[in-house]
Every structure is written in structure tokens, then in C-alpha cells.
């Protein structure tokens, strides 16, 4: 048997990797001056936001009016909208805001024309807007008894701002008389992203044509917030609750359209922020549409996708009567879970099936707990260590299987030579050898299969976890995005126009791992030249595809592979003894072995195939 010893080159490689990591950590620590500069920058940004809010309030107090001297323009306007010309065409906006969200509602159309998230900025330090500069439109289309087809965007609403306890209430009325009107009523609670939105009317029975449906029309272009528009676009899509609490979504990569029934809510998700419309009674039907606006990576493109929803509504006794809610806020499970009765947390892309379950009930709460008292990057490292410790029994089983196969290698090679011209006989004798030795060639695959759900769950967790958004670690300024350390003057297909460091470290670690698990056996077993190709291909694929992925995921795989390597080294050098394994296998060969059902079935199938082969030759 070969003498067990540590490869000095492998040890040197590990030491160098840790040395680089420690140096990068020390090198990238912000200085006290940099921390002070960041604090000053944030204070300037908050002051600018406050100044803008105050200026907006002053604007509301003194609304700008249409030039009423132009009698022809006024007459034309009143002629077009008929009875709703009672309300004076007064331009202006009203502000609703609390500590988390800022809204501006326009007199024209009565709709929200600006929605800003307080406390959040984009990758280039601009406040996060979900609605701005006409990117969104909400309107009701209806017919009147005098055969006009009106759109609420063409109507002027009269604003009245009041208080209901601690809540702010904005009543927007498009009047046909002093006591007859269409009303949009917004109600904002302190420190909440959910806005109550009621549409009702009074005295419009006979003015609105009740024989024709009301059409709700909601459109939005999703504003870009991240440094990679392609990456953000991958997680920007329409999600909706329908048909008995089923959660569905439109395609994220191409134009898509669906008509659904019993729709409870519609979410326009912009990666880490969402605009959601809920309806208390459920929409009977809703036609949903999504158009992809991103064809390639761009640093100047403003919008990622264009969304649209068309919903028919019925009048209630000849009047408007609909209870909605607007949600403008982060796609954060901690926030959305506050509205359990609406089920808005289901709009978060946890993943499907068991992968979503693992993300939602294991990784999300564990990471939330760890990051509550640890730096965000360190929390990932600790979570990785916990996962690897939990999976260490599977790692042990995998390495034990490899050790047994290594001990049997000379006998397998002998069988390959003896039956090189008879593949079926070679397979039968190999299976017989495994059975006698008490070795299962599939035992090494089972641990890998057990880890697959974790792999795919993490693939969704890191790029969509709001807790990681704009959280720095070492050289990475955002663990939910890529960690570019160099910008290229050109774009490499599939790779990008930048170089990310964590994917490089993860690729190096997985290369060493594959060297340990496949490198020693790749030249002597049949088919192993292909394994050498895979050993080089896997790290290369990680390097290429993870270059534009969440740096938190690359950090996880870097640390995970390092831990796995050290666990396997410990198992190899301090736990498993190949001499004992060899002796155990030889002892197993002496014992009578009874075929299990699977082995018996496999043997019978191979014998039948052999018989058919012989018959074919005759």
C-alpha cells in the first residue's frame, strides 16, 4: 500500500490562498478618513432629499393653474370630457410621505406620478425611484350615458388632504357637481409601504354607462437601479397571485402575455423593489403583459422591462366601488411578511419546490440571524461553515467510497484487461467484484445528490436576498452583485467587460478540490481521460459564468470548497486507514453474499442482453 503523506505543494497552495485573502481583507479596510467621507456624503444626500421634499410641499401650497384666459382651450377641454368639466383644470401635485416612502399625486389623472424609497440609493448613489418622469400610468376607462369614452388621465381632480388619527388621507375628486364625483382616496400609515387606495363615486348613476365595463389600465417601465442592467433584468418580472392562491410569473427573458382568473394581486418586481396592486375582492380576469427592453449590457439604458395589466371591472349599483392597496417598497421578506393576510411575501423569488422551501425556511432565517450581529460577509462565511459541518457525514461517505474504489483499482484493471473484448462479461464480473467486496459504486454519488438542493437553493438565495443588497465585504461593494476589481476596455462574450475576484478564487479552490477527488485516478480507469477534461472545464465554467453573478455566491463556494478540502485531508490523513479498508474488503470477499433485489435485477438484465446478443450472431 502507498504510504500516506501530505503533498507539500498542496499545502503551499492553501497557504498562498489564505495569505491572499488575509492581505485583501487588510488592504481593503476603509480608513477613518474614508469612513468620515462616506458619512458626510450620506448626510449631504439626506439634506438634499429633505430640501427637495420641502420645496415640493411649497409647490403644493401654491399650485400652478392653467391659463384660463384662453377661453377656447377651456371650452375644448370641457367639450371633450362633458359633465366632468365641473372641476377647474388646475395643475398641481400633493405630497404624501412618511419615514419610508415619498409619493407625489397629480391633480391631472389623480394618480401617483412619483414614488421614492427613503433610505435607499442606486448603485451610483441616486435615490431609488419606482415612479418618476412618466414611467408609470394608472387609469380607468369608462363610457358615459352621452356616448363619450373617458380616461381618468384626462380628468382633473380636486385634492383635499386631511388626517385620520395618525394616518394621512388624500381625497382626489373629479366632480360633475358639488355632490356628484369620482373619488380616488389614498390613505398612508406611519412607517408603512402599503398605501390604502379606494375608488368610489357618488351620484354618477345615470351619468356613467353601466352597460359597459370599466377597464383598469396599469402600465409601468421598470427603472434600472443596479450597475449591471442585464443582471438586474434577470430578476425583474411580473408575478401574480391567482386562481386560489397560485403564484405565477411571466417570462423574464422574452415578451410574454397571459390572461388569468381570480387575481388577488399583481406585482411589478424590479429585482429588489416592487410595485404591487392588490384588490380585496379579486379581479375576475386580468390580462398581463411583459416586454423585455434589454438586448445587451449597457451603462446608459434606463429601463429594463415594460409591464402592463388590463382588468375589466363592473359597476356596483351604477357606481364605482373598489378597495385596492398600493405597495411601493423593497422586495424584502421582513417587510412583506408584515402583510400576511395579503400573502405579498410570495412575490419573492425563493425558487420552486424544495429549493424555495430551503431558501425560505432555512437560509433566509439563518442568514438574518447571523447578520444581526456579524458583518454581512462574515455571516456568509459562518453560514458556509455550518452547512459544510452539517454535510460532513456525506463528505465522509463520499471519500470512503473513493478510498474503497482506489483499493479495488488493481483488480478492476485486471478485469478490464481480461475481458477487454467482452464488455458485457466485464460489466458482470465488475458488479460481482463489488458485491463480494461490499462496495457500492453508487455510494459516492448519493452525497453529491443530497447536496444538489442546497446548490440550487443558494443559486437563488444570493442574487435575490434583500439583506445582501449593497452590503460590502473586502473589495466587494455589493454582495448581491459582482465584485469587479478591474474594468476591461472591451467586452468578452459570456464573460463581460470586467474582472471579478471572488469567482477567480472559487475557481482555484474547486480546481484543487477536483485534483484531490479525481486527479489520482484519472489515468488508470476506463474513460478517465474525459475526467481530466472535466477537471479543467468545471473551474473554467465557474470563472466565466460567475463573473457577472452575486459575489456572495462566489464567496460561499470559495469558502465551501476550502473547507471541503480540509475536511477531506483530515479524513484521509487522520480518520481513514487504507490498510484497514483493504483488509476489510478482503474479509468481505470471504463472506457469502446474497444478492439484493437491485443487484439481482441488474444481473438478470445483463444476462438477457447477453443471450439476445448471442441469438443475433446466429
What do the PLM-derived regions correspond to, one by one?
Residues 1-59, 105, 199-202, 217-232, ...:
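Helix-loop-helix
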Residues 88, 93-345:
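Soluble non-transmembrane domains of integral membrane proteins
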Residues 54-91:
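Short, Gly/Pro- and small/polar-rich lid/capping loops
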Residues 84-87, 96, 508, 529:
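Generic low-polarity alpha-helical segments
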Residues 8-10, 68-71, 154-155, 597:
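Short linear motifs in intrinsically disordered/low-complexity regions
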